[in-house]
């Protein structure tokens, strides 16, 4: 469960290291975001010569949460930290060309097939 002010790790090579959620998209009073949801983020920590810089406001998709995601068979997939992949504001395609760490099968929609194909492991 990601809400406003939540700090997340970045799971791609866009140049950002830590980001903060500033808005959960998808409704005027929506409070929480889970795996597969799009959020508005600001870059809090970035590496030099990256594609993004500190202070940029972009969209991102949540790929891992500590809360986890419940499957129809009753199992729950949980992770050690919250992570997201930064998206281009207009096309909503990933800015980075590599994805680090596993992602869940819940991202397998028409929008995020690029992330699934770049990920080293799909759980």
UniProtKB/Swiss-Prot annotation:
Entry superkingdom: Bacteria
GO molecular function: large ribosomal subunit rRNA binding; structural constituent of ribosome
Keyword field contains RNA-binding: yes
Keyword set includes Zinc: no
Pfam families: Ribosomal_L14
Signal peptide: none
One GO biological process term: translation
PROSITE patterns (alphabetical): RIBOSOMAL_L14 (PS00049)
SMART domains linked to this entry: Ribosomal_L14
GO cellular component: cytosolic large ribosomal subunit
Keywords on record: Ribonucleoprotein, Ribosomal protein, RNA-binding, rRNA-binding
Record-linked PANTHER family: 50S/60S RIBOSOMAL PROTEIN L14/L23 (PTHR11761), LARGE RIBOSOMAL SUBUNIT PROTEIN UL14M (PTHR11761:SF3)
Function (record text): Binds to 23S rRNA. Forms part of two intersubunit bridges in the 70S ribosome.
UniProt similarity note: Belongs to the universal ribosomal protein uL14 family.
Subunit structure: Part of the 50S ribosomal subunit. Forms a cluster with proteins L3 and L19. In the 70S ribosome, L14 and L19 interact and together make contacts with the 16S rRNA in bridges B5 and B8.
Stated name of the protein: Large ribosomal subunit protein uL14
Organism (species): Erwinia tasmaniensis (strain DSM 17950 / CFBP 7177 / CIP 109463 / NCPPB 4357 / Et1/99)
Gene assigned in the entry: rplN
């Amino acid at each position: 469960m990601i809400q406003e002010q939540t700090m997340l790790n970045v799971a791609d090579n866009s140049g950002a290291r830590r980001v903060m959620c500033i808005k959960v998209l998808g409704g005027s009073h929506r409070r929480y975001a889970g795996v597969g949801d799009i959020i508005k983020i600001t870059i809090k920590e970035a590496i030099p010569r990256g594609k993004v810089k500190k202070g940029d406001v972009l969209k991102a998709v949540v790929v891992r949460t500590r809360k986890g995601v419940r499957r129809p068979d009753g199992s729950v997939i949980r992770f050690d930290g919250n992570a997201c992949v930064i998206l281009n504001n207009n096309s909503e395609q990933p800015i980075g060309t590599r994805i680090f760490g596993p992602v869940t099968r819940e991202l397998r929609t028409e929008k995020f097939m690029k992330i699934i194909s770049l990920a080293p492991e799909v759980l």
